[in-house]
Amino acid sequence: MSDCPNDPYAYLLVHFLEDPDGYAERIYLDVSDGDNPHRWIPFNGRRPVVTSDIGTTGVRDPHIIRNPQTGMWYIIATDLRVFGGDNGGWYEWSHHASTNLIVWQSPDLLHWEGPRMLDVSQRADGTHMQLGMAWACECL
């Protein structure tokens, strides 16, 4: 992790960029300069760490979580492409948008598998609930 500072204590920031010209609705990781939350160092040379080629192909509102039993890391994000997408607007996106979350997994925060879709409207019997969208997920 040559992009990371040498201090073993730091904060990790998972985020997306809103970029109407570059279609940057992809996921980025930054690490704080030690325990200073005012200075951030981008992972991966300012390039996204994960992107989506499924669903709407845009990902926003990411959340990162670690499974303490397996040590596996997960990034879970909203499946929504605003820029370069359908130009539907907030009403359309909030009432008739994707009910999928996009998921990646990694053993080390450097090597990611995925993406895969998780449809939160699907019931155990395979039928679907009437939902308008799935946004800004967080996990415990």
Residue ranges: model-predicted function:
Residues 1-136, 140:
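Beta-rich carbohydrate-recognition and catalytic domains
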